[in-house]
Amino acid sequence: MTPENFAAIAAEGYNHIPVTRELLADLDTPLSCYVKVANGPYSYLLESAAQGGEKWSRYSMVGLPAKKILKVFGHEIVLEEEGVEVDRFECTDPLEYVEQFQLQYRYPPIEGLPIYTGGLVGYFGYDSMRYVEKRLADSTPPDVIGTPDILLMVSNDVVVFDSVKGKIHLITHANPENAAAYQNAQERLDEMVGKMQRNIPASVLTPEKGPVVHEEDFVSSYGEEQFTHDVDRIKDYIREGDVMQVVLSQRMSILFEGEPLNLYRALRSLNPSPYMYYMHLDDFHIVSSSPEILARLDNGAVTVRPLAGTRRRGRTETEDLQLEAELLADPKEIAEHLMLIDLGRNDIGRICKVGSVEVSEMMTVERYAHVMHIASNVAGAIVESGSAMDLLRATLPVGTLSGAPKVRALEIIDEFEPEKRGIFGGAVGYLSWNGNMDTAIAIRTAVIKDHKLYIQAGAGVVADSVPALEWKETMNKARSIFQAVAMTESGLGVRDSSENPRMSNEDEERVVVPGDASA
């Protein structure tokens, strides 16, 4: 962009103008770029592996440390700039505040830019649903971890990798109200280029080893006895016709002194997934390899994609195909998947144009490193007055993390789960400056805070659930994090099961409870 182009766009009234530079992407990876240019508080790395983890998707995003941060605790808004709190106030509707906050950044439509150039990046926790479902506003379980209900970074300096075109886009933003804005933006891009040319620190190349980790070292805040007892109590609700399904979850924790970035490196190696993210949020970190979209808005097109129904991967291609056929022939799996499709259609139907909602992909099988899931695509066209926040209000939390009917299931979750879910089950991703949104469900996700690592997983309780198998299902879903922690503490060396037999992958022999692939 030339100074003349910049001035012309500014004359149209835009105050948040992207200024970019391109490099070849043949000498760096998104991970090495993150280490060199971003690794610090309020930074992030977003990556994506295609189905099965066999190849990486087109775009990866690196966010440099953000200067402005928006946090929400209940109904209290906290604004920070460069590490200093600048405002704190009460707000009736935090979701409405977030929407209005973003509108102050007037972003121009410019062709030729990558799908993402920056925006509000972070998460909306599971408990954000209480801003929408007023009857649940006062039933929040105790908050043990203490993370904000919402945290969003104002991400203006980003590096976007385009693996198809082999390019790296360096992007910053400038406000023309500052006479030197364009020149300052060019200087920031120069600085980014300089950082890209650095060497990777030796500490990253030689990670330290920690203690040997076993699965039983993770401590549940729920406990198997109480969890299985509560599964039976939920089945009573189901028999009485009060609810059809409830996704009950348990949280596990372990002392963790390792580097969170190394945990991400381990997890992306062990379990590549469509939504992989590492977020350094000052006093805590989020590390995740989520298989499931929560909601996406792309130029008016709405997408949700229920995952429900699970089988392990076969040891051979023949066995893999046999397990797929078994999965698609299981009437219980199919019935529960159809229920979740209906929930998705109902959710987005509230904010989409009449007649636009359709099931664009029906019950395909997606394969990942250890499991396969039934997946369907539900799509629609958002109403003319609709926004990304309207879509988030309509979909959070998704049925695969709550149950059906949704509101009654949410009430039952509050009744039984001993701790506030927090980030688990919420939405992690971005609201881009151009009005689009892409968010994943916060599952297969570790939260690291105060030298402890937390992982949470759930199971869908239905009328014929076996309590012991529901408990086992939560353990199986957490296993990718268990293994990643063990690999991190080994110095990122790969331990096989003979070296650490209690961390073996029981997915090979597990019994799968139908209909709860996501949680």
Task: Place the predicted regions along the sequence by residue.
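Extended alpha-helical targeting/anchoring segments
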Residues: 1-519
